[in-house]
Amino acid sequence: MNANKQRQYNQLAHELRELQTNLQETTKQLDIMSKQCNENLVGQLGKVHGSWLIGSYIYYMEQMLGKTQ
């Protein structure tokens, strides 16, 4: 193999190692983002369900039993 071809392969190998490192870091960051989104989403869903429960209780009390607060 000539020197020029060897230099090109060495450069390609270096760039592939750098790409692998960047992909690993990107994967770590995506995992962190996914965990944060899931935690926030679960919290938001809990708030929405709680609001629905309270709203339906108030509606029931006002409409079905004739009570107002």
Curated annotation (Swiss-Prot):
The answer on whether this UniProt entry bears the keyword Heme reads: no
Location in the cell = Nucleus; Cytoplasm, Cytoskeleton, Spindle; Chromosome, Centromere, Kinetochore
**The keyword Ribonucleoprotein belongs to this UniProt entry's keyword annotation:** no
Among the GO biological process terms of this entry, one is: attachment of spindle microtubules to kinetochore
One Pfam family, please name it: DASH_Hsk3
- Principal cellular location given in the protein's record: nucleus
Q: Which UniProt keywords apply?
A: Cell cycle, Cell division, Centromere, Chromosome, Chromosome partition, Coiled coil, Cytoplasm, Cytoskeleton, Kinetochore, Microtubule, Mitosis, Nucleus
GO terms under cellular component: cytoplasm; DASH complex; microtubule; mitotic spindle
Lineage: superkingdom: Eukaryota
Traits of the deletion mutant: Degron-mediated knockdown disrupts oligomerization of the DASH complex and leads to defective sister kinetochore biorientation and mitotic arrest with large buds.
- Stretches of the chain forming a coiled coil according to its record: 1-39
Q: List the disulfide bonds.
A: none
Family that this chain belongs to: Belongs to the DASH complex HSK3 family.
What does the UniProt record say this protein does? Component of the DASH complex that connects microtubules with kinetochores and couples microtubule depolymerisation to chromosome movement; it is involved in retrieving kinetochores to the spindle poles before their re-orientation on the spindle in early mitosis and allows microtubule depolymerization to pull chromosomes apart and resist detachment during anaphase.
Classification via PANTHER family: DASH COMPLEX SUBUNIT HSK3 (PTHR28289:SF1)
Assembly, per entry: Component of the DASH complex consisting of ASK1, DAD1, DAD2, DAD3, DAD4, DAM1, DUO1, HSK3, SPC19 and SPC34, with a stoichiometry of one copy of each subunit per complex. Multiple DASH complexes oligomerize to form a ring that encircles spindle microtubules and organizes the rod-like NDC80 complexes of the outer kinetochore. DASH complex oligomerization strengthens microtubule attachments. On cytoplasmic microtubules, DASH complexes appear to form patches instead of rings.
Entry protein name: DASH complex subunit HSK3
